[in-house]
Regions:
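A short SAM/SAH-binding and catalytic strip from SAM-dependent methyltransferases
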Residues: 108-120
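Conserved class I S-adenosyl-L-methionine
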Residues: 1-36, 52-56, 76-79, 137-162, ...
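A short glycine-rich, Lys/Arg-flanked "PGG" loop and its adjoining helix->strand segment in the class I
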Residues: 122-134
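Core SAM-dependent methyltransferase catalytic element
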Residues: 178-179, 186-205
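Short alpha-helix
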Residues: 163-178
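Class I SAM-dependent methyltransferase SAM/SAH-binding core
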Residues: 44-46, 50-98
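A short acidic, Gly/Pro-enriched loop at the edge of an enzyme's catalytic core
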Residues: 97-108
Length: 205
């Protein structure tokens, strides 16, 4: 088994106990309020983990909206499915660099607390760009600062010890190279957010 999949499978049942879920929910709610999410959007939650972001998103979405939530860890997906029961959500075990979705499908994609874990960030970015509709948005978001993210990964397990989050401006520059328009790139000691957009005209067939 892929060591990273095994790592996340092993911690799936422990994940929600490591953080105050009420406090996390408040942080997510405040962040989502700033993102001008329409009630009818079709959204992809990449690296959904135990479903915390999906759960927060559902509170902002209407009955016609859809959330596709994917993760490489089958156990994480099982925990999420048990915790978040809503007909607007589809749960799948899938790799972010090779998703099962049609091109130009999603209005918005979230990578919440997951980006450093992608083994091939360029391939992942290109795949997410493919499934985004023109002018659709990608959010790379962490609710803690970059230094803390990297410190946690360095000491957690050899499976994730090299999973480094780049400075926001450096990752934003890469997203530009990979065909996105960057709308914002900000980081503080307690926050990290890059919002990017797929251009209206991409030259793709």
């Amino acid at each position: 088994m892929h060591s990273k999949v095994e790592f996340f499978n092993n911690i799936a049942e422990l994940w929600d106990g490591w953080e105050d879920r009420d406090a996390l929910g408040c942080v997510m709610k405040a962040g989502l309020q700033k993102m001008e999410i329409s009630s009818h959007e079709i959204i992809l939650d990449v690296g959904c983990g135990t479903g915390n972001l999906t759960q927060a998103l559902l509170g902002r979405l209407g009955p016609g909206a859809k959330v596709a939530a994917i993760d490489i860890s089958p156990r994480m997906v099982e925990v999420a499915k048990t915790k978040v029961r809503d007909g607007r959500v589809s749960w799948q075990v899938a790799d972010a660099c090779q998703t099962p979705f049609s091109s130009n499908y999603f209005d918005r994609i979230f990578c919440f607390s997951v980006w450093p874990h992608f083994d091939d960030p360029k391939a992942t970015a290109l795949e997410l760009r493919r499934v985004l509709r023109p002018l659709g948005r990608l959010h790379i978001w962490h609710h803690i600062g970059r230094d803390k993210v990297n410190e946690i990964h360095a000491t957690a397990s050899p499976a994730v010890s090299q999973d480094i989050l780049l400075p926001a401006q450096d990752l934003a520059a890469l997203l530009l190279e990979w065909g996105f328009d960057v709308l914002e790139a900000e980081e503080t000691e307690n926050h990290y957010l890059i919002s990017a957009q797929k251009p209206e005209k991409t030259g793709e067939c």
